[in-house]
């Protein structure tokens, strides 16, 4: 009897020591290796140069700029200069993106038209500020690439179109704000027409291969008034014919 009792005790002890089946650990979020560089960019290059709009600073702190440049330029993504993205186009330097975004005075829910999607970075910044963004790119390959990256990063409030941005995107007009990221030699008439009353339009204007002027146009009583925001250098706006 004592021996049988001892065997039962041993069996229970062994059962208690058996390893439990553990649930697999939850997947870990991908680590962003550029968090520090992005914070330094915002502090030194943007806030340090006078940009004060909290929504702009928050968006630039959040948007992963390195995801919008070719892989070989990822390490330079947060430096304050433009970078090539292919097809003769560039991603604007962070300070210019911030300056133009601040000038638009975008509010959550605003409908914003962007002419010149390029890499998609400017659209992502505006989307992170809460805007509903409609962006037009004339180069099919860039339009496709930008749409793919924006989709991967979850920017559901950005709508892309491969078309000639000189004529805007009339189907979704009027817009609270319009931003143009390439330089024509004049203000396209369609853009002024598609701007909502009280809206703001930021655009570089000037000759190809020379210094251009960044302008802020504000629409009041159907008229556009212009403010000079300073000298800039952008790739030319192509298209403009039907």
State where each predicted segment sits.
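N-terminal auxiliary segments of SAM/dcSAM-dependent transferases
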Residues: 17-72
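Conserved nucleotide-cofactor-binding alpha/beta core module
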Residues: 105-225
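Solvent-exposed, polar/charged alpha-helical surfaces in well-ordered, non-transmembrane soluble domains
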Residues: 39, 43-44, 54, 58, ...
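Conserved alpha-helix/loop element of class I SAM-dependent methyltransferases that forms part
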Residues: 40-43, 48, 77-87, 91-109
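Solvent-exposed, acidic/flexible segments
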Residues: 31-39, 49-53, 89-97, 115, ...
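SAM/dcSAM-binding transferase cores
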Residues: 12, 19-37, 175, 193, ...
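Sec-dependent signal peptide recognition
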Residues: 2-11
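Short clusters of hydrophobic/aromatic residues that line enzyme substrate/ligand-binding pockets
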Residues: 68-69, 78, 83-85, 169, ...
């Amino acid at each position: 009897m004592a021996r049988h009792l001892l065997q039962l005790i041993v069996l229970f002890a062994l059962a208690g020591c058996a390893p439990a089946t553990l649930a697999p650990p939850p997947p870990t979020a991908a680590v962003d290796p550029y968090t520090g560089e992005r914070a330094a960019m915002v502090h030194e290059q943007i806030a340090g140069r006078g940009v004060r709009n909290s929504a702009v600073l928050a968006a630039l702190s959040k948007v992963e700029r390195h995801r919008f440049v070719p892989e070989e330029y990822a390490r330079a993504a947060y430096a304050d200069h433009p970078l090539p993205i292919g097809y003769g186009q560039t991603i604007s330097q962070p300070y210019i993106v911030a300056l133009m975004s601040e000038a638009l005075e975008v509010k959550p829910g605003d409908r914003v038209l962007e002419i010149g999607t390029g890499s998609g970075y400017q659209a992502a910044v505006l989307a992170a500020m809460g805007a509903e963004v409609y962006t037009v790119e004339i180069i099919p390959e860039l339009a496709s690439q930008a749409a793919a990256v924006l989709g991967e990063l979850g920017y559901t409030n950005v709508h892309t179109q491969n078309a000639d941005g000189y004529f805007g995107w009339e189907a979704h007009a009027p817009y609270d704000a319009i931003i143009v990221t390439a330089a024509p030699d004049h203000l396209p008439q369609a853009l002024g027409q598609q701007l909502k009353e009280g809206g703001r339009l930021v655009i570089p204007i000037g000759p190809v291969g020379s210094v251009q002027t960044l302008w802020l146009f504000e629409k009041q009583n159907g008229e556009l008034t212009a403010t000079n925001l300073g000298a800039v250098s952008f790739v030319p706006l192509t298209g403009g014919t039907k």
